[in-house]
Amino acid sequence: MSKPYVVGIDIGGTNTVFGIVDARGSILATGSIKTQKYTEITDYVNALHEELSRLLAQENVTDQIAGIGIGAPNGNYFNGTIEFAPNLPWKGVIPLAQMVREKFNIPVTITNDANAAAIGEMTYGVARGVKDFIMITLGTGVGSGIVINGQMVYGHDGFAGELGHVIVRRGNGRLCGCGRTGCLEAYTSATGVARTAREFLELRNDESTLRQLPIQEITSKDVYDAAVSGDKLSQEIFEYTGTILGEAFADFIAFSSPKMIVLFGGLAKSGELIMRPIREAMEKNLLAIYKGKVKLVLSELKESDAAVLGASALGWEAS
């Protein structure tokens, strides 16, 4: 009988979360360690091995794991590496899949976190059975995973699909964390929304409840709360953000003709505040042959579970 469980590991800049998952996408148990606590990769892998082994033993499934999937910033599917991830404590190229495989003697697959989210959506979520879609994660950054004909698009080197870093404002665009200017992420991530709020408040005289807050401490949640309460400036910030996203989505559709675009992450939970301007700008800018054909949908995976589920879906692939 094939082994009934896989392990999903989601590596974030602050925490690493892992879980034991069955083929239906039910999470048996989860655990975590502090990513930032370990400045040496060997110490990190040792801690991960210790905590995950404890969880497997606790659930009495140590010998029932088919594979391990890892989602990580700048994870390279082809090489099994994390490469030059700016928000992780280990620099350069880290052969993480090999290191974890040697600890557990179980097949290991790694990819970037947005690709893992797309695979999770395709395996357990709203994109199940959909062969062509784009996953967009709207959080601190903007990530993406592209699926064409049922296959993740990795490109020749494993780094295809960095749609958060397409240029949407040329010339005098905002500086992005990647070092370039004008990237989609600089405008439409949670930090981008907060930055738009600061710019609007500094450049305009509109009344806004946001003016009651220290300007440098304003967050995207502050903007959302104000918008829901009827603050016109905050609503305009969402309009601005959604329009940029919708225009970008129209371009994305032109090169892959997806059946749907799936949105996930904190900003996506803003509902129609963000969905309406995205939808309107996307349809307005679509080539005629694509109009009315592409669904814009929200992920159905629980945010607390999605990262582990996405990574776990890779575990079945590894097995």
Regions found by a protein language model. Give the residues of each.
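A cytosolic small-molecule/anion-sensing beta-strand core signal
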Residues: 72, 78, 148-149
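Short loop/edge segments at beta-strand edges and connector loops
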Residues: 110-114
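Hydrophobic "anchor" residues
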Residues: 27, 82, 152-153
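Short hydrophobic alpha-helix segments
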Residues: 31-33, 86, 156
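ATP-binding/phosphotransfer module of carbohydrate and carboxylate kinases, centering on a glycine-rich
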Residues: 1-67, 77-79, 98-108, 123-130, ...
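Acidic/histidine-rich catalytic cores of soluble enzymes
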Residues: 118
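Glycine-rich phosphate-binding loop of actin/hexokinase-like ATP-binding domains
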Residues: 128-187
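A charged helix-plus-loop insertion that forms the helical arch/lid used to bind
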Residues: 81-92
